Amino acid sequence: MLDFNSKTHITDRINHFIDKALAEQAEQPRKYLGASIVGAPCERMVQYEYMATLGLVDEQPVDPRVKRIFDRGNVYEQKAIEWLAMAGFMWGGHQHRFSDFDNVFAGHCDGILVSGPECGIRYPMLWECKCLQDKGFKAIVKDGLKKYSDAYWVQIHVYMAYLELERCLYTVVNANTMELHHEVIELDIEVARQARQRVERVITATKLGEMVPRCTSDKSYFICKRCEFASDCWK
């Protein structure tokens, strides 16, 4: 309980109520394993995410600040859609869905571009969008998405494979400067195949009451330190 005495700053008082409202705005637990997690650096992390969909482990509540970051990303994604439409790009609808393994593995892409200005790209193509801070934005501009994030890289290849698309336009919004960066990525079907095999291993192991290997034998490893399932994994 926040102590609303005269020394409490107005920022803390107002944010207390905002954070409380966001915390109470509980989202329904996801009932499927999403494409955004299958490229995680640890296969056991993927398994725990799957187990959470079955109610076998508890997910940690989302921090209100993180919820605001998610909301910001959704706002910028919608604006990017509007900007592209203004520039003459045409959409084949939004939030196209795929599912596999009896709906255990599923996902929704941001959109599919079906036509647009003559700018050297071929349609149709998957469209995905991310809003990143300046550091992440510059890293993608410099080295490309593949080097920046395995999770994002695997996610778009899963979408392309299941939605039968051969390429993706990946748009990144710089949250600090509002710069835009676009990268065209061709489908590598092997990436999607390995992701599906990973999902299959996780499902099979869970049904057998087994745990897939961790990415490390050191619980102080940086990936473990930021994993919400670390306490369950190492107990």
For each predicted feature, which ranges?
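Active-site-adjacent loop/helix micro-motif of nuclease/hydrolase catalytic cores
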Residues: 135-141
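Metal-dependent nuclease catalytic cores that hydrolyze phosphodiester bonds in DNA/RNA
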Residues: 1-126, 133-135, 146
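Metal-dependent nuclease catalytic regions and adjoining charged, substrate-binding loops involved
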Residues: 5, 139, 146-153, 158-235
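A structural signal for short, well-ordered beta-strand segments and their strand-loop junctions
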Residues: 92-93, 126-128, 167-172
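Basic side chains
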Residues: 44, 130, 196-198
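Short, small-residue-rich loop/turn micro-motifs
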Residues: 130-133, 174
